[in-house]
């Protein structure tokens, strides 16, 4: 083991690799399932595919770059900054995709009769494009000047060096904590989290209200329709918990770094916080896809057709989304 890599770093790298090995195949399988099953082509699954694409990129690109940054190679300042920014872009896209799915589920409960007229594939595509554009804006903001270049240049000049600074590439050396806390956390992480709390509370309220009133829905069976939506809402509550569990620790540590520079942060806490954020990408296929029967049946067909060489029966596109025991 190279002397520059500590035991904590080695453990961190191993966990990151494990997360990537789970995240990439799991999310590729989600995308594959939508491709082969026509029943998974409505607007709802467009958002799930967008989330899966972001999560594949987290496992295939963000995690390798995070490992590179953790090792800390010697690079030019802007080279290191370019390595750090994709992490911000793709993790932000995951957050916005989660929010889009929450809003989509809210609309299914709020306007069940008009849902398909309001949430069309075209509008879903526009929403997805908007999420990605916002993610690039948020993630590339450090490239436009909100970074630590001035401080690094002062230290570089104080040593009598000329030209662009060469530094040990580490995330906190190039990315401003003011950006991470005031802009990234207080604007693009915390508000979506709070908004999702409100959305999920409203979803539960609407479902309970409709179940009590027994108002007819598009399915013609209010108990069945809203009972299914209640099960889905419980999944959303789990997603909310996992989102908070995955993202808040790292941002709390960033706040400590900014507001209490003298406070000691054990390295192991930083490593745990980082792989929790990446681990959220590995959780999503399990929480979203495996609770939907159409996905489960399609996964089984893919497995039998392509890995066991045993063709599965044709997919019944009229399968209900939820099993009775979910």
From Swiss-Prot:
GO CC term (a single one): calyx of Held
Positions bearing carbohydrate: 159
Keywords linked to the UniProt accession: Cell membrane, Disulfide bond, G-protein coupled receptor, Glycoprotein, Lipoprotein, Membrane, Palmitate, Receptor, Transducer, Transmembrane, Transmembrane helix
One GO MF term attached to the UniProt entry: G protein-coupled receptor binding
CDD domains cross-referenced by the UniProt entry: 7tmA_Adenosine_R_A1
Membrane-side (Extracellular) residue stretches: 1-10, 70-80, 147-176, 260-267
PROSITE patterns recorded: G_PROTEIN_RECEP_F1_1, G_PROTEIN_RECEP_F1_2
Pfam families found in the cross-reference section: 7tm_1
Cellular location(s): Cell membrane
Protein name: Adenosine receptor A1
Gene: ADORA1
